[in-house]
Amino acid sequence: MRKIIVGSRKSKLALTQTNWFIDQLKALGLPYEFEVKEIVTKGDVILDVTLSKVGGKGLFVKEIEHALLTKEIDMAVHSMKDMPAVLPEGLMIGCTPKRVDPRDAFISKNGASFKELAEGAILGTSSLRRSAQLLAARPDLQVKWIRGNIDTRLRKLKEEDYDAIILATAGLQRMGWDNEVITEHLDETLCVPAVGQGALAIECREDDKDLLQLLAHMNDGVTEKTVAAERVFLHKLEGGCQVPIAGYATLTENDAIELTALVGSMDGSVLLKEKVVGTDPEKVGLEAADRLINQGAKELILAANKEQQ
């Protein structure tokens, strides 16, 4: 019986996601056993600066990918939104399980909704994507950076001067905390989710044919298609955590992909948004990127990068 070593970050959420996925694989009843190897990533260690200042995308996966390439582990369970648009040679996304709720969760100290927040209220987020879109809707708000895992951020909301914070609904759901803590779900029209938000990426080596066959059982075709369109868009714009960039695709009743793509200025005063519908994920992603580039997205990205240097 082959033992599959599964790499995971050490956070509660990462381990919850990893163990959930292993349970799904075990339920298939195939001759494999599993062991979790916990790995510390750069993103887990550097908590005193915003993600965008320390290298953005890839911060939570580089060390894990190194362990895959050196065969210390056989596969890894990641949050799709942490995945860089391009993977190292020899690695691939072996499967994309069914996506859960992609929306952002708004959590306020006193139960006020986003619209009800007092003028000048302090909103905690470490995401340029969230801050740009929410400042566009409420320019009166003050954004204050907040880092750390879910428990840390919820504690900071209680103990520090934040009036509200934003977290991914998916993470709270996976921890079983969504009903307790979420004040409201932010509609995708108000705050377009991050590329891949709510989805998991199971990464493995391209040449591990046995494992790829096993992972195929867990692949969700709709999630694979929609996330592929989002990631093509992200790659074309070379966007990471350093830029207010968002992309969320769904499948229509006719099986067409509908992608909403957005690039913004850091302060939210400019938001460029496009909706593209098509059947081919690659074409849809490229079309969305091209349309935004024609509107001036590249200039916004350059300005955002400059602002953070």
Swiss-Prot record:
Binds 1 dipyrromethane group covalently. It is an enzyme of class 2 (transferase). It comes from the Bacteria. GO terms for biological process: protoporphyrinogen IX biosynthetic process. One of its GO terms (molecular function) is hydroxymethylbilane synthase activity. One of its GO terms (cellular component) is cytoplasm. It holds the Pfam family Porphobil_deam. The modification S-(dipyrrolylmethanemethyl)cysteine is found at C241. The keyword Transferase applies. Its EC number is 2.5.1.61. It catalyses: 4 porphobilinogen + H2O = hydroxymethylbilane + 4 NH4(+). Its cofactor is dipyrromethane. Keywords: Porphyrin biosynthesis, Transferase. Pathway: Porphyrin-containing compound metabolism; protoporphyrin-IX biosynthesis; coproporphyrinogen-III from 5-aminolevulinate: step 2/4. Signal peptide: none annotated. Belongs to the HMBS family. The porphobilinogen subunits are added to the dipyrromethane group. HAMAP family: Porphobil_deam. Monomer. Tetrapolymerization of the monopyrrole PBG into the hydroxymethylbilane pre-uroporphyrinogen in several discrete steps. This is Porphobilinogen deaminase. The lineage of its organism: Bacteria, Bacillati, Bacillota, Bacilli, Bacillales. The gene is hemC.
